[in-house]
Amino acid sequence: MRLFLIVLVGICCQLSAQEIKKVDSDVLFTCYKQGKSGDCVSVGITKAAICVFGINGVFKEKVIDETHTEVTLKNGKKYTLLKEEFEMADTAMHIKLGKDGDPEIMRYAIKCFAVMAKVKQDLESIPTFEEAIYKLQHGAHGRKIFYDLGLENNVDVLEKTPDDITAGIAWTKKHVVFVSNGNMDKYGKKVPLDPMYYGGLRLKP
């Protein structure tokens, strides 16, 4: 009986950790922002994904042991990440907490970034996780970034960014931003969508 209770408590704790928390787009605009690295694509897609699916909802997680975590993407693919890979992503993604930002949201964004690097490493046969992070920060394009989160079944690629996008990204040749309801993220500030952002992605459940 005692063993059963211990197992039950463990299962409940794991389920609690996976509780999906919805986040309003207005919160995401200001919660965290791009730092010194070239993370605009990652910042944009993580905000859009969290807006649609919530914290703990972008992919499923299963903790295997203290050093291994298995994630299952929306497309059904599974990846196993090491604890040190999450730590490496945390160090590499130089995002900053915005004014009145929620650290929990930013931590989940970094976790999404780690998963993106792992997927990119696999899809592009990149030798090391560290190199995959570098390529994610210095060569990722908004038009294809959804593959790195396994969201190809949850996206519409648009030639023009309409004002009615609930959550997505928009781009120019040099920059990518999170967009929602006619507004865009300008380094942690909510501003009206600039017409210079000519293309985009719409994320959907």
Indicate residue ranges for each PLM-predicted region.
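Predominantly the structural core of cysteine protease catalytic domains
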Residues: 33, 38, 77-185, 197-204
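Bacterial Sec-dependent N-terminal signal peptides
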Residues: 1-18
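Flexible propeptides and autoinhibitory/regulatory segments associated with cysteine proteases
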Residues: 16-65, 162-172, 179-205
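Acidic helix-start/capping segments at beta-turn-to-alpha-helix junctions
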Residues: 62-76
